[in-house]
């Protein structure tokens, strides 16, 4: 089976998952495409930006920009990820770039690749003109649980809702964001660290490792997963937190961290007691 990978990051999910796919031998990677993200700042773009700022507030918007590193650069503290183009060069995989996702350039590259299925790893909205080109369409990895956390950043909204569990979802791509039929889901515990920032970065590494294994599983038996795919049903969509929502996330993080520490302490005491011999 031939797959084409579309990504918007040189050091993100695609760079992490590509070695897993190569080593698994479950598929042939016909091409990797990097979206350079050259956004046309037209009226529609500016209108959407203003609408978002009104919704989450100027401080929320600025804080959102500050938090971006938590989900990208900070991951390197816990996991070294090789640059994507370097991996492609080493394994002789065709690597191309495109100015933006929904462009003629991307469309032409997809047709040239002639892949059976497309794989989206770390992208924004993908239009039908792109995702309908591969024989079996495209699939996406969303690092949260669907449909409850559509368009949500990993970990933070779980903490907002006082949950100590996060996860990933592999799903088909349709005309909306994070709404396609479900193929596979997995959950992991949030790894609470001394700060929210470190908690996000450390848990994101565990999410990457879990979703890479899940992706290999799906691609290894794609027909079966497509046959058993389930529609999502009603869901809830998220965006960047407002500054007040962020403060709530910080408070909840402190509570959940304390609960996690107490739980670990109790487990250690219980384990030590079991090891005591008369």
Task: Identify the residue ranges that each predicted region occupies.
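One-carbon transfer enzymes
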Residues: 1-278
């Amino acid at each position: 089976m031939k797959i084409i990978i579309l990504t918007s990051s040189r050091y993100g999910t695609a760079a992490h998952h590509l070695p897993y796919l190569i080593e698994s031998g479950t598929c042939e990677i016909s091409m990797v495409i990097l979206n350079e993200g050259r956004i046309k700042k037209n009226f529609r773009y500016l209108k959407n930006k203003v609408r978002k700022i009104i919704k989450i507030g100027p401080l929320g918007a600025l804080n959102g920009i500050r938090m971006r590193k938590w989900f990208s650069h900070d991951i390197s503290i816990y996991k070294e990820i090789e640059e994507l183009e370097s991996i492609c060069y080493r394994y002789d995989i065709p690597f191309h770039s495109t100015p933006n996702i929904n462009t003629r350039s991307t469309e032409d590259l997809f047709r040239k690749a002639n892949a059976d299925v497309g794989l989206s790893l770390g992208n924004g909205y993908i239009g039908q003109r792109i995702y309908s080109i591969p024989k079996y369409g495209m699939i996406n990895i969303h690092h949260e649980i669907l449909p409850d956390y559509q368009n949500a950043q990993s970990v933070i909204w779980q903490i907002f809702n006082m949950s100590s569990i996060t996860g990933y979802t592999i799903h088909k791509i349709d005309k909306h964001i994070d709404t396609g039929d479900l193929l596979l889901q997995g959950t992991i515990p949030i790894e609470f660290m001394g700060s929210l920032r470190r908690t996000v970065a450390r848990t994101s590494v565990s999410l990457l490792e879990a979703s890479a294994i899940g992706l290999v599983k799906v691609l290894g038996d794609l027909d079966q997963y497509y046959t058993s795919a389930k529609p999502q049903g009603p869901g809830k969509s998220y965006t960047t937190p407002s500054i007040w929502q962020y403060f709530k996330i910080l408070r909840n993080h402190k509570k959940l961290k304390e609960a996690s520490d107490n739980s670990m302490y109790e487990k250690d005491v219980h384990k030590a007691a079991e090891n005591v011999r008369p």
